[in-house]
Amino acid sequence: MAQLRSAGLLAATLALALASPAHAVIGGQPENGALSTQSLMILSSNGGVCTAVVLADDVLATAAHCVTGTQEHRAHYRAADGTPVLLEIAAKAVHPEYDADAIATRRRSIDLALVRLKQPLPARFQPASLATANVREGGVVTLAGYGTTDESDKSGRAMGVFNAVDLAVVEPYGPSSILLWLSDAGSAGRGGCQGDSGGPIVAGSGVVALSTWTTGAGQRNCGALSQGVRVGPQRTWIDATLEGWGRRAKWQ
């Protein structure tokens, strides 16, 4: 696919992809509460869609793979009247330990990035609280995002609405100080999917991780395990980056 190289083309692609709003997150439910005011979308010029978490009125946190590998990225939300809005990115910081080939090579990677927007978000968006809590196996967290509810759909119409789902923390490879693994305790195939990367994973009222990856049964890519990068262990890097931008994250 040819890369799109202008905001106009990005807007046209967005209009086609999101012409018919649909649900997001496999097996999730619409989330219209506080969490929805702390999240928005990231669009890439290669057609990629991700979710991002608001840290300040012009700063977002997302997965590193959402803002690397293409020439253009935009933050997206819908105005009160439903009009699509695209915001340009002024700066981005990718975690120094991010490895784009980590999945294929099974190397360690911290799939995390921060982006600063060229203009502030509307007042209806509020900064999320990041949490250092170390949720362990058996704990229940909420995963949310703008991703697809049907991974077989290639039109983009099965994504674009903010949904959330409760999942159980699992430790298939033992405790991890970097990653958080989640599974549907009811074995109904619920979880994150394409478009949910960078979205919040919440315990209580704090974001403990950002979605980064999913697996599925058989030929599917979603519905088995959902993975996130923990934000607590990366606090030093997050705080230092935001300080350089004259911003501060909220922690609990």
What are these regions (language model features)?
Residues 1-9:
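Bacterial N-terminal signal peptides that target proteins for export
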